[in-house]
From Swiss-Prot:
Residues 691-710 have a biased composition (Basic and acidic residues). It holds the Pfam family Fungal_trans. This is ABC-transporter-regulating transcription factor. Residues 158-217, 691-779 are annotated as: Disordered. SUPFAM superfamilies: Zn2/Cys6 DNA-binding domain. It comes from Emericella nidulans (strain FGSC A4 / ATCC 38163 / CBS 112.46 / NRRL 194 / M139). Coiled coil: none annotated. It is a single-pass membrane protein. One of its GO terms (molecular function) is zinc ion binding. Disruption phenotype: Results in a hypersensitivity to miconazole. The gene is atrR. Its main location: nucleus.
Length: 854
C-alpha cells in the first residue's frame, strides 16, 4: 500500500494528470505538473522524505513512474517494495519470484471535479454569448484571461480615460506574479481586483469611494450585453431564458396570436405620401422611427417577400394612423378621414397581445409608444397609461435603459435606441406628474445618455428666426422630463411627504432654480414667458405644448408651499428665526403669485390651439381647465384684487373654448366640464359684485355716523341671499364652516413682506368669503363634493387660499376664510387625471339647483 500514489505516469496508470487551467506561480503551495506537491513556500524541507524532494531527478522520475504498484509478494506481505530490477530486495532475500501484475484500476474522479466541470460549462456558455453579441471573436476563446483584461482596459483608456497618476495607490497583480504599473481608472475602465491594495478605505478616503463608484458603474456597463436570435429579436443579457414564447406555442393560443386586419394597407403611392407627412411633421420633433430603416422595411413590405414580424406590422399601421390624424388636424382632409386613422390603429391593436407576450425587439417598443401617442388625443387616458408602461417594460428586456457601450452597436442604431427610450421616459414622467401615479421607470436604475444635441440627421433641431443658429427641442424636452421626475419624487411621493418644513422649503427652492435654469437655456424665440413667433403649424403646436408643460410644472412646484401655507407668516417666521440650514430661494416667498401668473399665461396660450374638435385638444385640455380653477380660487380668496375682473374674462376664454368643442352628443364629458367651468365663472362674477357692494357700503359708513357693525352686514347678507336665490340657479357650493376667521397671523405677514397675490389687498373694506355664505347657497360636505367634481391636479390650484387678507384700518379684523386648503394633500394625490374624472362623473357630479328656499 505504501507504493500506491508514490508515482504517476503513462507507464503506471496509462494517462497523465489533466492540465486543469493555466499554472500560476505558487504562493502558499501548489502542485506540480505531475500532480505532486510543490513545497517551495514551506520553511523546513526536511520534514519531507527523500523521494518527495527528488522530483527533479530524471532517474528517480523513471523509477517512480515504473512503480505503479508493489510486486505481488510485497503486496501480499504488506511491506514496502523498492521496485529494483529484475527483483526487488525483499524477493531476493526471500528467494521468491518477483512478479508485477498489471491491474487496471479505475480511479475515482478527484474531489471537486464536478464543480470544475460545471465552471467550464458555464464559461463556455458565456463565451458563446459573447461571440453572438460581437464582443468576442472566434480566436478570443483561447486568449489568456489576463491578456483579455488588459485588452479591454486599453480599449477603454483609448476611448477617453484619464492619466494613470489619478490613482497612484491602486495596483493590480497580473497572473505572472509581477507587479504592474499603477492602474489608471476611468468611467469606463475595467475594474481590477487588488491583490496588494492600500489600507485606505472608502470610509477614510472620499477619493477612493468615488473611484469605487466609478469602477462599479464601469463593471455594470461592461457586464451588459445584447443577444440577437435567428429571428432578429434582441434580448438583454439579464433577460435570457430558455423558456421563450417563441418555442412554447400551445394550440390554445393560436387564435389569440392570429392577426386580424380591419383595413388593408393603402397602395404604395398613397402610403409613401402618408409616410412623408409623418416624417416631415411629426417624426422630426418626436423621432420615434429611423427614417432610412423604416423606408427600407416599407419597400420590403410592398415586395413579394414582406417582413412578417408583428412589431413591424403594428409600427407601419401606427404611422399610417398618425399620418391621417395629422392631415385631419391640419384641415387638409375632411373630418371623416379620421375614421381611417382609427381603422389603422385597430390593425396595430390586433397584435397587442403578441407584442407584449412574445416580442422583444425595438419595433415592438416603437409600436407601443406610437399607439400611446395616438390615444393621448382621446378623453380616456387609461389606454395610454397601460401602453406606456408596457413599452417601458419591454424596453428593459432589450436594455434600452442602459448605456450600452459594450453592446457593439453602430452609432446610428445606438442613437435611435436612445431616442426611443427617452420618448418612453417623457411620456411616463408626464403621466406621473399630471395624474399623481408613480412612474414606471426608476431614475436610479438607468444610465443612458441624452440624445445627441446636434445629430447628423438633424432630428429635433429647429432653426432660429435670425437664421444664425438652431435649437434641439427634442433634447430640451428630455431634460425637462428629468425635472418633472424630480418634482414628483421629491415633492409628491410617499417618501417626500415625510420631509421636515426646512427640507421641503429647500426642495421647492432647488427645483424652482433648476426649472428656471432650464427655461433660460431655451432661445428667446421659443422660451416660455415670451411671444411665440413660429409660423409653421405643427411647430407651433410643439412649442405651445412646451409652454403649457413649463407653466404646469412651475405651478406643481410652488403649489406645495401654498398648500402648506408656508408663504404666510409660518414661512416668514421660519426664515426670521434662522431655522433654515441654508439660504432659501427668494421665489419661495412668491409661490402664490407665481401660480396665478402661470395660470394667466396658460390661458393666453389657447389662441394658438387649433379650433375645433381635434384630437390635440385632449392632449392640452388639462392645462387651461386647471388654470381656470387656479384663477377661481384666487378670486374667492382675493375678490378685491386689481386684476380680478380681467381674471374673470380669462375664465370666460376657457368657457368659450370648451363651448367650441361641443359639436355632437358624443362629447358628453366636455359638456359636463363646460357646465362646471361655466358655473365657476358665474360664481366668480357674483363674488366680485358682492365685494364691490360691500366696499361701497363700508365707504358710506365711514363717511356717515358710526353704526353698529353687525346690523348693516347682516342686512346686506340677507338681501343678497334673497336676490341671488331669485335670479338664477347657483352651484351648491360654500366653504366649510371650519374656515373661520383668525386674524392672528395677519400682522406678521405685513411685517415680513409675505403679501397676498397683489398689493391691492391692502385696500380697506376687503370682505371675506365667509361673509358670502348667503350669496352661494350652502351645501353639506362641500369640500368632499368639490374633490369629486375635479381631478387631483385640477384642484391643486385651490390651495392658493392659505394667505389671509391683511387687517384693515381700525380694530375690525378681516376674516381669514381659508386657513386650511380646500383639499387635503392625500386627496389631490389620488391616481386620476382630470380627463378621467370628467369622463366618469355621471354618478358623482352634483346637480345644479337653486339651493334651499328661504
Amino acid at each position: 500500500m505504501d507504493g500506491i500514489g508514490e508515482g504517476h505516469g503513462p507507464n503506471g496508470m496509462g494517462y497523465d494528470m489533466p492540465m486543469l487551467m493555466n499554472q500560476h506561480t505558487p504562493i502558499f503551495g501548489a502542485y506540480g505538473p505531475e500532480g505532486s506537491p510543490v513545497t517551495t513556500a514551506l520553511p523546513n524541507p526536511s520534514l519531507h522524505d527523500e523521494a518527495s524532494m527528488s522530483i527533479g531527478d530524471d532517474n528517480n522520475d523513471a523509477k517512480r513512474r515504473r512503480i505503479a504498484r508493489a510486486c505481488d509478494m510485497c503486496r501480499k506481505k504488506k511491506i514496502k517494495c523498492d521496485g529494483k530490477m529484475p527483483k526487488c530486495s525483499h524477493c531476493i532475500n526471500y528467494k521468491t519470484d518477483c512478479v508485477f501484475t498489471q491491474v487496471e484500476k479505475k480511479r475515482n474522479p478527484p474531489k471537486g471535479a464536478k464543480y470544475i466541470e460545471g465552471l467550464e460549462n458555464r464559461l463556455g456558455r458565456m463565451e458563446s454569448l459573447l461571440r453572438l453579441s460581437g464582443l468576442l471573436s472566434e480566436d478570443d476563446g483561447k486568449t489568456d484571461l489576463g491578456t483579455l483584461e488588459k485588452r479591454l482596459a486599453d480599449r477603454s483608456l483609448s476611448a477617453g480615460g484619464y492619466n494613470a497618476t489619478n490613482s497612484p495607490t491602486r495596483f493590480s497583480l497580473p497572473l505572472n506574479g509581477q507587479p504592474s504599473q499603477p492602474a489608471s481608472t476611468s468611467r469606463h475602465s475595467t475594474p481590477r481586483v487588488d491583490s496588494h491594495s492600500s489600507p485606505r478605505t472608502a470610509a477614510t478616503s472620499p477619493e477612493s469611494q468615488k473611484e469605487s463608484e466609478n469602477e462599479v458603474e464601469g463593471l455594470s456597463d461592461m457586464m451588459c450585453s445584447l443577444v440577437t436570435n435567428n429571428c432578429g429579436e434582441t434580448r438583454y443579457i439579464a433577460y435570457i431564458d430558455d423558456n421563450k414564447w417563441m418555442y412554447w406555442k400551445p394550440e390554445i393560443f393560436s387564435d389569440v396570436f392570429a392577426r386580424r386586419v380591419f383595413k388593408p394597407l393603402p397602395p404604395k403611392e398613397e402610403a409613401l405620401s402618408l409616410f412623408r407627412d409623418f416624417f416631415d411633421n411629426f417624426n422630426c420633433m418626436f423621432p420615434l422611427f429611423h427614417e432610412p430603416t423604416f423606408m427600407h422595411l416599407v419597400e420590403k413590405q410592398y415586395s413579394r417577400d414582406p417582413y412578417e414580424g408583428s412589431g413591424w406590422w403594428a409600427s407601419i399601421n401606427v404611422v399610417l394612423a398618425i399620418s391621417h390624424r395629422l392631415r385631419v388636424m391640419s384641415n387638409l382632409v375632411p373630418q371623416e378621414e379620421d375614421k381611417k386613422a382609427w381603422l389603422y390603429l385597430k390593425n396595430a391593436m390586433g397584435v397587442l397581445t403578441e407584442l407584449t407576450m412574445r416580442n422583444t425587439d425595438l419595433l415592438s417598443v416603437q409600436a407601443l409608444l406610437g399607439m400611446s401617442l395616438f390615444l393621448q388625443g382621446t378623453p380616456n387616458p387609461q389606454p395610454s397609461f397601460f401602453l406606456v408602461a408596457a413599452a417601458i417594460r419591454l424596453s428593459h428586456s432589450i436594455g434600452l435603459h442602459k448605456r450600452g457601450s459594450g453592446f457593439g452597436l453602430n452609432p446610428v442604431e445606438a442613437e435611435q435606441r436612445k431616442r426611443v427610450f427617452w420618448i418612453a421616459y417623457m411620456l411616463d414622467k408626464d403621466i406621473c406628474l399630471r395624474s399623481g401615479r408613480p412612474p414606471v421607470q426608476d431614475d436610479d436604475d438607468m444610465n443612458v445618455e441624452l440624445p445627441s444635441e446636434d445629430p447628423p440627421d438633424n432630428i429635433g433641431n429647429v432653426p432660429l428666426f435670425d437664421g444664425k443658429g438652431k435649437f434641439n427641442m427634442f433634447r430640451t424636452l428630455c431634460k425637462f422630463s428629468i425635472i418633472e421626475s424630480k418634482v414628483y419624487k421629491r415633492l409628491y411621493s410617499a417618501t417626500a411627504s415625510k420631509q421636515s418644513d426646512g427640507a421641503l422649503l429647500n426642495t421647492i427652492g432647488e427645483l424652482d432654480r433648476e426649472l428656471e435654469e432650464w427655461k433660460d437655456s431655451i432661445p428667446i424665440d421659443f422660451r416660455p414667458e415670451h411671444e411665440i413667433k413660429a409660423t409653421h403649424g405643427p411647430l407651433i403646436l410643439h412649442i405651445v405644448v412646451l409652454h403649457f408643460a413649463y407653466y404646469n410644472c412651475l405651478t406643481t412646484i410652488h403649489r406645495m408651499s401654498v398648500h402648506h401655507g408656508y408663504w404666510t407668516s409660518r414661512l416668514s417666521n421660519y426664515a426670521i428665526q434662522g431655522l433654515n440650514a441654508r439660504p432659501l430661494n427668494p421665489r419661495v416667498f412668491l409661490s402664490a403669485v407665481l401660480c396665478v401668473t402661470a395660470a394667466r399665461a396658460s390661458i393666453n396660450l389657447i389662441k394658438y390651439i387649433p379650433q375645433g374638435d381635434f384630437a390635440c385638444v385632449w392632449l392640452i385640455l388639462y392645462y387651461p381647465v386647471s388654470a381656470l380653477v387656479t384663477l377661481f380660487a384666487n378670486i374667492l380668496q382675493n375678490p378685491t384684487d386689481a386684476r380680478a375682473r380681467s381674471d374673470v374674462k380669462l375664465m370666460n376664454v376657457v368657457v368659450n373654448f370648451l363651448s367650441t368643442l361641443v359639436s355632437d352628443e358624443s362629447n358628453g364629458s366636455i359638456k359636463r366640464m363646460l357646465g362646471v367651468c361655466g358655473e365657476f365663472e358665474r360664481i366668480a362674477q357674483v363674488v366680485l359684485d358682492k365685494a364691490e357692494r360691500e366696499s361701497q357700503s363700508k365707504k358710506k359708513r365711514k363717511a356717515g355716523p358710526e353704526e353698529p357693525r353687525d346690523s348693516p352686514q347682516a342686512a346686506s347678507t340677507t338681501s343678497t341671499k334673497k336676490n341671488t336665490a331669485n335670479t338664477s340657479a347657483t352651484m351648491p357650493f360654500s366653504p366649510p364652516p371650519q374656515y373661520g376667521a383668525d386674524s392672528q397671523d395677519s400682522s406678521s405677514n405685513a411685517a415680513n413682506g409675505a403679501t397676498a397675490f397683489t398689493s391691492s389687498q391692502t385696500m380697506p373694506g376687503t370682505s371675506s368669503i365667509s361673509d358670502m355664505s348667503g350669496t352661494i347657497p350652502a351645501m353639506p360636505r362641500a369640500s368632499q363634493d368639490f374633490t369629486e367634481m375635479l381631478g387631483p391636479n385640477a384642484l391643486d390650484g385651490l390651495n392658493f387660499n392659505s394667505q389671509p387678507p391683511l387687517t384693515s384700518t381700525g380694530d375690525v379684523p378681516i376674516a381669514q376664510p381659508f386657513q386650511q386648503p380646500f383639499v387635503p394633500q392625500d386627496l389631490w394625490q389620488m391616481p386620476m387625471t382630470i380627463e378621467w374624472d370628467w369622463a366618469d362623473m355621471s354618478t358623482n357630479f352634483p346637480v345644479f339647483d337653486s339651493g334651499p328656499s328661504h
